[in-house]
Amino acid sequence: MPENSPETMTRNRSIFLLSLGCSKNTVDSERLIGQARRKGLSFTNEPDEADIVIINTCGFIADAKTESIDEILAAAEKRKNGEIEALYVMGCLSALYAAELRAELPEVDRFFGTADLPEILNILGTAYDPATRFERSLLSPSHYAWLKLSEGCSRTCSFCAIPKMRGRYKSESMEDLLQEATRLKAKGVKELNLIAQDITPYGLDLYGTSRLNDLMRELSDLNFDWIRLLYAYPLDFPLEVIDTMRERENICDYLDMPVQHICDRILASMKRGIDKQGTIGLLESIRKRNPNIRLRTTMIVGYPGETRAEFEELLQFVREFRFDRLGCFPYSHEEHTAAYDNLEDDIPEEEKQERVGELMELQEGISEKKNRALEEKALKVLVEEVEDNLAFARTEYDAPEVDNECVLDTAGIDIRPGDFCMATIEESSAYELVGRIKNVIP
């Protein structure tokens, strides 16, 4: 550890926290800031004004690792030059590669894993308080927030190192989640996005069965305007959730369910626990139970051994099923995974990228047609930003950060971020709706 250890720092130091990666990481960062601020510590949004820098890293795929390492290196240079007094690194990358990072980056004062909030607070000169563990300072716009239902994952997907980074699946209690949600509601949050590494088995470890549906009903009763479900695993998904979604007006007709692939051989190699027939049957059941639902999914292409015929099978599935939202990643050969240990990364990177492009071009055409069907219709939207005479908003069918944007002429109406309004859609493209605001919803 460098000289002038920051463990004895006084409370007049300013802290900058850089949160990288997914929304689960964001929640971890919000909890750290919330607890620290509650104890009187000061944070800044400007890295150049900080005495202490904390980087919450992502280690999921190669691109995320590279971004995390680049940010650490930049901050380490500041630490080396005396521009900051301390540098701490936390999160998934730190959990997975702590020993290697310590050896390569002596400028970093301390590395922490994903469950080290008490230790981080301690080194900042304050104490962890279990009674306020859900105290959060939101990093998202104040009108929406993430509610993390669990920590870790007990699935054994061959391409994923999340269980190594975050441990086995551990649900938060319903009581704690309802308490946290109540606090978020009091902060003015209107849209609650339910997240986890996997929301499907929520409660199984605590109650012996999935309690996702029960939790949704309880959260719905708290009167959020929108409640949204993200990161649902296909295997053992509780279909009663879709019935509740259809019945409850404030639960968005939206489900994010990454299926990753459709070829039986690849699904088996991925250790997904579900085959093509089971996947299609589940998705058809979901649409049958709620015809108005919008389904988002994620695919991986270029998985080891993926033949052209297997990729064509995936294309045909997407062509026929017509997902409402779809993202695609090229396979990333990650250490600490079964695929890395047992399979050869034999698809050239150029070929992977070509397959990503081909699949996304197909989806673009599907999305264009689906959005065109919304033209001349009036939709309820949530305003995200206002700039001059334009408002940028989302429908209930679009999650924050990843889905479509709705660009609206405010028509002189006084509108602010966080407002709901009715909008008439006049034009569309694959990933954007364009229209005008009819009226603000009180």
Swiss-Prot record:
GO molecular function, one term: 4 iron, 4 sulfur cluster binding
Pfam families on file: Radical_SAM, TRAM_2, UPF0004
Biological role: Catalyzes the methylthiolation of an aspartic acid residue of ribosomal protein uS12.
Cofactor binding notes: Binds 2 [4Fe-4S] clusters. One cluster is coordinated with 3 cysteines and an exchangeable S-adenosyl-L-methionine.
UniProt binding sites for [4Fe-4S] cluster 1: 22, 58, 92
Catalytic activities: L-aspartate(89)-[ribosomal protein uS12]-hydrogen + (sulfur carrier)-SH + AH2 + 2 S-adenosyl-L-methionine = 3-methylsulfanyl-L-aspartate(89)-[ribosomal protein uS12]-hydrogen + (sulfur carrier)-H + 5'-deoxyadenosine + L-methionine + A + S-adenosyl-L-homocysteine + 2 H(+)
SUPFAM superfamilies from the UniProt entry: Radical SAM enzymes
Keyword Cytoplasm listed: yes
Any single biological process term in GO: tRNA modification
Location of the TRAM domain: 372-439
Record InterPro entries: Elp3/MiaA/NifB-like_rSAM, Methylthiotransferase, Methylthiotransferase_CS, Methylthiotransferase_N, Methylthiotransferase_N_sf, NA-bd_OB-fold, Ribosomal_uS12_MeSTrfase_RimO, rSAM
Residue ranges occupied by any MTTase N-terminal domain in the UniProt entry: 13-129
EC assignment: 2.8.4.4
Superkingdom of origin organism: Bacteria
Principal subcellular localization: cytoplasm
Name of the featured protein: Ribosomal protein uS12 methylthiotransferase RimO
Keyword Transferase: yes
Residue intervals of the Radical SAM core domain: 139-369
Subcellular location: Cytoplasm
One term under GO cellular component: cytosol
Positions annotated to bind [4Fe-4S] cluster 2: 153, 157, 160
Keywords for the protein's UniProt record, in alphabetical order: 4Fe-4S, Cytoplasm, Iron, Iron-sulfur, Metal-binding, S-adenosyl-L-methionine, Transferase
Required co-factors: [4Fe-4S] cluster
